[in-house]
Amino acid sequence: MSSSYNTIALSSTPTFLLSSAAAGPGPNNFNRQEAAMTMVQQQPTSSVAPPPKKRRNQPGNPNPDAEVIALSPKTIMATNRFLCEVCNKGFQREQNLQLHRRGHNLPWKLKQKSNKEVRRKVYLCPEPSCVHHDPARALGDLTGIKKHYYRKHGEKKWKCDKCSKRYAVQSDWKAHSKTCGTKEYRCDCGTIFSRRDSYITHRAFCDALIQESARNPTVSFTAMAAGGGGGARHGFYGGASSALSHNHFGNNPNSGFTPLAAAGYNLNRSSSDKFEDFVPQATNPNPGPTNFLMQCSPNQGLLAQNNQSLMNHHGLISLGDNNNNNHNFFNLAYFQDTKNSDQTGVPSLFTNGADNNGPSALLRGLTSSSSSSVVVNDFGDCDHGNLQGLMNSLAATTDQQGRSPSLFDLHFANNLSMGGSDRLTLDFLGVNGGIVSTVNGRGGRSGGPPLDAEMKFSHPNHPYGKA
């Protein structure tokens, strides 16, 4: 009874002393607080620190008293070091050889454990440039020196069938084969990695690429043109992507694409479908001319890149190669009109339909009320002499190829607005304005003698009056 009472008194003493010390200042408060802190610190501890375990030396840090053994590469790489003198059978361990000698009735003995402390052995790497060739960095295990030599200086003969990794030690290959393919790190882009470090490196690059693409959204205009049959065929060259900027379409009042907007093309769209009308919807297996459609003065900002000097002189329409066939003579799909449609809008810029048989497409396009007036007005700033030189070259090329002279049976309704007469500079075909243009761009003769007959009676001094 008294013992339990003493225990309760001892357990409650610190609390009582602390509360008394906190009650207020007094002559004995400091001594009581110091005694309470001493009792708290003197609580018995039952845990005793265990003695440190003896650990073996780390690889490359041998015991200074160990015996240093240097083996040759041939000895290290030998699979069977211990040979039987009777049958020349080899064994990896001496104990196995001794057990084998029993079968030959030869004296044998196994190593017996002695009470004497055995001196440890360390092994040097035979490669002079290796760090373990130094006795201070020798390896303390015969199997360890063998694996080290195979891994660092030997041939990797073991190959994984799943990931094609090669190993020099068979145990390493077996350990890898058990885990190969079980751990997969899959990136959002679809790439699969078996190693985490490779996955982290790839993921950092992949995320950076996604962020860069999100900050700079661009339209791959070359890819869009290539999807329609090739960029060069439709007139997209090196400077096309820079010329097709937003300033050329919506913000530049002097842009050469003003007639397209007036003809019904919506050029103020979002970036995703801004170039929808300029991408061909159907491919043409026949290669077209390599020049772009139109080119005017440099201040009009058109999409023109020429590689022939003819474009610099004519300024409006680029002639193709003389070896091209009839329907690829001009890259004039801008003025194209289909035979099975009565729509009056301007067709696709780069579509080369099957019904545009050569120069007749130029006639139909230029005489249509929806395209000729707009195009002529827009190109009113071009030099009138360029237009004259253009028509002269057209006639010369046509005469060389033996094509129909009706190509030049043209009549511009807005020629008066350009400061000229009611016809072009020279009536080099003797037509005298005999063309009637319908609304849908289908032109025809309104009467009079055939064109061939008129050309026979044309002015004899005219350079293009002869058939």
Swiss-Prot record:
**Where does each C2H2-type zinc finger lie?**
82-104, 123-153, 158-181
Which compartment or compartments is the protein found in?
Plastid, Chloroplast
Query: What protein name is recorded for this chain?
Result: Protein indeterminate-domain 6, chloroplastic
Q: Which InterPro entries match?
A: C2CH-3rd_BIRD-IDD (IPR055187), C2CH-4th_BIRD-IDD (IPR055185), C2H2-2nd_BIRD-IDD (IPR055186), IDD1-16 (IPR031140), Znf_C2H2_sf (IPR036236), Znf_C2H2_type (IPR013087)
Native organism is Arabidopsis thaliana (Mouse-ear cress)
Which is one Pfam family of this protein? Answer: zf-C2H2
Among its keywords, does the record have DNA-binding? yes
Report the function annotation for this chain: Probable transcription factor.
Principal place of residence = plastid
Q: Which residues bind Zn(2+) 2?
A: C187, C189, H202, C206
